[in-house]
């Protein structure tokens, strides 16, 4: 298992600096480059690629990113998938050309023979991506309706599992911190499956309390602000259990609870999503839903390989099961 010492050594900084960066300490005076290096080092050390024979690059594949580099550092989930795509593409003999959506100009994307699109896109953006090259594989969005292969992760099932876990330990007052995602064009707002599943299951269990549901952005700062709102607004009725839509939001939420001297998990249990590297280094370590990001990235490349070999192959969606990992942030 990767330790803070390992990360500090690889990134060339102190152990204390690593700890504060992994906990998104906003009072730490470091350069953006140092913060980026530490976060990326943590994810790279946590990622363990399968050993494969590497071959000389023969095919150029575009990897389309929908988030900026800074946005990726605020939600490390996509960075995990990116590393898996890069490793599998290299072993398959693909030259990977990494681009953001705004960079899709003809002069920068010549000779592309396939596309992997990481993130969420509206119909206009899908058309732009498909015009670049065929075939296209989308990762983290079901695109069967657009005749494209897709790789996704099951988040609805774990929401139900978490709620039932809370009930089993006597917690029926359950809060939720979630986020909203919008296409880069701003034309479409995507419904988050975690939020929808939370609403559905809580209503089915007759546990839904709209006042316990807070929606912001998938960032540490938003998690911090949303939990502060919950603490201020709800006071003594603050829920004993919180589901937080991703780990980096949960880091901010833990900071707000700590500042308010609210003990975790004795007073509030917190369970989040994605199991990125920082989840192991929070205080206390986060209970979280592990997304199969390694397998998602590898499968995206393998689906692309299959479609390049057989363009008439019927598109398919591969939806990976997620696993609840219990740590010290929850009862």
Curated annotation (Swiss-Prot):
What keywords would UniProt list here? Carbohydrate metabolism, DNA-binding, Galactose metabolism, Repressor, Transcription, Transcription regulation
Pathway listed for it is: Carbohydrate metabolism; galactose metabolism [regulation]
In its keyword annotation, does this UniProt entry include Transcription?
yes
Enumerate the GO terms in the molecular function aspect.
DNA-binding transcription factor activity; transcription cis-regulatory region binding
Q: Which stretches are labeled DNA-binding?
A: 4-23
Question: What GO biological process term is on the record, naming one?
Answer: galactose metabolic process
Q: What Pfam families would the database entry show?
A: LacI, Peripla_BP_3
Domain HTH lacI-type, first and last residues per copy: 1-58
The domain of life for this entry's organism is Bacteria
UniProt function note: Repressor of the galactose operon. Binds galactose as an inducer.
Task: Report what the protein is called.
Answer: HTH-type transcriptional regulator GalR
Organism of origin? Lacticaseibacillus casei (Lactobacillus casei)
> Corresponding gene?
galR
């Amino acid at each position: 298992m990767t330790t803070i010492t390992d990360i500090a050594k690889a990134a060339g900084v102190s152990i204390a600096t690593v700890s504060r960066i992994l906990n998104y300490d906003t009072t730490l005076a470091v350069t953006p480059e140092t913060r980026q290096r530490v976060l990326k080092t943590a994810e790279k050390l946590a990622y363990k690629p399968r050993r494969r024979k590497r071959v000389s690059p023969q095919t150029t594949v575009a990897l389309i990113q929908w988030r900026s580099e800074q946005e990726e550092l605020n939600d490390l989930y996509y960075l995990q998938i990116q590393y898996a795509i890069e490793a599998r593409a290299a072993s398959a003999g693909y030259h990977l050309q990494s681009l953001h959506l705004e960079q899709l100009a003809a002069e920068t994307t010549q000779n592309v023979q396939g596309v992997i699109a990481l993130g969420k896109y509206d119909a206009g953006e899908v058309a732009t991506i498909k015009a670049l090259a065929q075939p296209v594989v989308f990762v983290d969005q079901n695109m069967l309706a657009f005749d494209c292969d897709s790789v996704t992760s099951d988040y609805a099932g774990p929401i139900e599992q978490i709620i039932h876990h809370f009930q089993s330990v006597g917690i029926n007052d359950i809060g939720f911190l979630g986020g909203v995602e919008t296409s880069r064009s701003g034309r479409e707002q995507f419904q988050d499956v975690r939020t929808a599943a939370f609403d559905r299951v809580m209503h089915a269990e007759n546990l839904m309390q709209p006042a316990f549901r807070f929606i912001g952005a998938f960032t540490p700062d938003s998690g911090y602000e949303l939990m502060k709102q919950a603490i201020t607004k709800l006071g003594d009725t603050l829920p004993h259990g919180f589901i937080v839509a991703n780990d980096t939001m949960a880091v901010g939420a833990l900071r707000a609870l700590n500042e308010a001297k609210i003990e975790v998990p004795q007073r509030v249990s917190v369970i989040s999503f994605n199991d990125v590297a920082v989840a192991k280094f929070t205080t206390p370590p986060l209970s979280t839903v592990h997304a199969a990001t390694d397998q998602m990235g590898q499968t995206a490349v393998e689906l692309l390989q299959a479609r390049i070999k057989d363009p008439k192959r019927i598109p398919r969606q591969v939806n990976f099961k997620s696993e609840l990992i219990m740590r010290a942030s929850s009862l």
